[in-house]
């Protein structure tokens, strides 16, 4: 598995805590089996249990679906975890869209990356961990020679991604039963 060479961090205050006691937010590529398991548990909780995607039941009832796919076994894929202090509570995944990337590859996939499976546990969403996770993924892909990254974003998160410098392209498309917007970011100025 490729590993980016830097760690990303930010601070945020927890409700009920003094602003003088910051919550340290960090993002790192998965390095241990325990971190990899935590990455997949968070994805399952958010996408299958909460959102009912990938064959799960919406609203936390059931949730027997599986959000894993062939990219999870790709040695070029980077699985990222986000922590609030020492608690793993967020994830994102990125991988190159090379000429052998199957249906994900376009006619000119060289230098293109895809970011997906961005998830933060509900009880931690108020901390703002999503932005450091996205920035970590963008920076990692850029440092590995990427020139463009794409992601398919749920409509509720389009403004958030635009705020982070992403641009919309095309119309909404269906993905796992929900509408998603294809968005792109130029990686050439991100390192």
Locate the predicted segments by residue.
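Conserved N-terminal entry element of GNAT/NAT acetyltransferase domains
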Residues: 1-33, 190-191
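Active-site rim helix/loop that mediates acceptor-substrate recognition in acyltransferases
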Residues: 40-88, 93
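Short hydrophobic/aromatic beta-strand or adjacent loop that forms the aromatic wall/cage
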Residues: 75-79, 178-183
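Conserved beta-strand in the GNAT
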Residues: 81, 86-97, 102, 112-119
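Conserved acetyl-CoA-binding loop-helix of GNAT-fold acetyltransferases
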Residues: 120, 126-139
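Conserved GNAT acetyl-CoA-binding A-motif
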Residues: 134, 141-154
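Conserved active-site alpha-helix within GNAT-family acetyltransferase domains
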Residues: 143, 155-179
């Amino acid at each position: 598995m490729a590993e980016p060479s830097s760690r990303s961090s930010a601070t945020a205050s927890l409700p009920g805590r003094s602003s003088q006691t910051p919550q340290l937010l960090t993002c790192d590529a998965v390095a241990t089996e325990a971190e990899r398991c935590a990455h997949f548990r968070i994805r399952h909780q958010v996408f299958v249990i909460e959102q009912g995607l990938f064959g799960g039941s919406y609203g936390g009832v059931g949730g027997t679906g599986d959000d894993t796919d062939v990219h999870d076994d790709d040695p070029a894929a980077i699985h990222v975890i986000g922590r609030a202090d020492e608690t793993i509570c967020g994830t994102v995944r990125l991988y190159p869209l090379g000429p052998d990337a199957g249906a994900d590859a376009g006619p000119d996939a060289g230098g293109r990356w895809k970011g997906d499976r961005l998830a933060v546990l509900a009880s931690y969403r108020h901390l703002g961990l999503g932005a450091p996770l996205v920035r970590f993924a963008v920076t990692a892909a850029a440092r590995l020679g990427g020139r463009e990254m794409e992601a398919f974003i749920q409509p509720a998160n389009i403004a958030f991604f635009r705020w982070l410098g992403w641009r919309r392209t095309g119309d909404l498309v269906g993905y796992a039963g929900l509408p998603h917007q294809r968005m792109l970011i130029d990686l050439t100025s991100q390192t």
